[in-house]
Amino acid sequence: MQTVLAKIVADKAIWVEARKQQQPLASFQNEVVPTQRNFYDALAGTRTAFILECKKASPSKGLIREDFDPAAIAGVYKHYASAISVLCDEKYFQGSFDFLPMVSKVAPQPILCKDFTIDPYQIYLARYYQADACLLMLSVLDDEQYRQLSAVAHSLNMGVLTEVSNEEELERAIALKAKVVGINNRDLRDMSIDLNRTRTLAPRLGHGVTVISESGIHTYAEVRELSHFANGFLIGSALMEHDDLNAAVKRVLLGENKVCGLTRPQEAQVAYESGAIYGGLIFVPTSPRAVNEAQAQAVIASAPLSYVGVFRNSPVAEVIARAKNLSLAAVQLHGSEDQTYIDALRAELPGKVQIWKALSVGETLPPRNLNHVDKYVLDNGQGGTGQRFDWSLLQGQDLRNVLLAGGLGADNCVEAAKSGCAGLDFNSGVESQPGIKDASKLASVFQTLRAY
């Protein structure tokens, strides 16, 4: 143990001694009662588990979330998490034990105290502040320390997340009969990230051990792929760095998905509640899903999706007016708009409004080399055909700024998601008739996307 980790642990020993003076164990130990929230049960089962983390700062990134409100964060996480992790280290993560009860009060899930635990005092303190589980790191503890600390936690019905970061620690975790093993993809000695650590270490753990992949997971594509190796994920920074936390969680758990062709307020509500991030409003008069500005305003008022206006060869002035009047998150161009058109649009469009370009895929993949285009939507033909193109064309492509469209529904959305696109664009495949979205079909596609 050296470098960053050694310094953190040395400082933690100083902190523990100071805290013992300030808040002696004898002053609160008789108020510490065993928890009723079972960490092990919360992570068990066939569905991939998510431990979502409340994290204000870190040594590698500095301040991550300036507007850090643990109760508000828990209010979002409680809809998605299996358990919630709370950073309690003060010096390096700007954490606090005071955050634990704030989160526990809002969310019914087990709360994990994320600290560099080296002393039984910290476990009693964590439970006193309403934690239901604690982190024990084999990079920090020898076997005897681990057994002692684990026994204290279990005496309070608390769960233990046993963290390993290499083969030697993994072998120790197996010998120590750890129930939940977290494989840290970050090397705390030099702060580097390697997702291969999960791929190589996880298969060594036997049946009955819950494997959690920690650190460096940012995308739905990574989650889907690593879910073959791990039973769950601990995710913090990838969520905390986004202002819209709800959308950030959806992006990682489900993908960056859009429901296009919304015409009625109730459809937007179902799309949002099911897990969509974007809602598409079509301003192409010939489309059976076309809306006027008043209809669009009614849809927008009904649900807090990020709204995308869809246009085809419209005058630049019209696109800009709609984007401003409706506070659109993006405009999607579905016609023959070229670089000159896009440059003119970008010059006048509010800075926060993205430009998306739909591309028709035939026998080959068209180039994606336009300036000022934030995302591409790959579709079969001019869109709205309900037909898919040959997805094998996507193999080996960088698709991080691509949404996939064309005939997507519950029967093929998983195959589409495996392409590695940032997200999927649903339309006709979730309708009962053109322009009328079907609530059960919408719910079904998002349940299917989450079934991994």
Which residue ranges define each predicted feature?
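An N-cap/entry alpha-helix motif that binds or orients negatively charged groups
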Residues: 1-67
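N-terminal small/glycine-rich loop or linker at the start of catalytic domains
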Residues: 42-63, 96-102, 147, 245-256
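Hydrophobic faces of well-ordered beta-strands that scaffold small-molecule active sites
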Residues: 50-54, 84-86, 111-114, 134-136, ...
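N-terminal active-site wall of soluble small-molecule enzyme domains
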Residues: 60-154, 161, 169-172, 198-201, ...
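Catalytic cores of alpha/beta
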Residues: 118-130, 165-176, 213-235, 240, ...
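Glycine-rich phosphate-binding active-site loops on the catalytic face of alpha/beta enzymes
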Residues: 125-144, 182-192, 229-252, 276-288, ...
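Active-site/ligand-binding-proximal alpha/beta "capping" segment
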Residues: 178-258, 376-413, 422-425
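C-terminal helical cap(s) of enzyme catalytic domains, especially alpha/beta-barrels
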Residues: 195-205, 227, 239-260, 293-302, ...
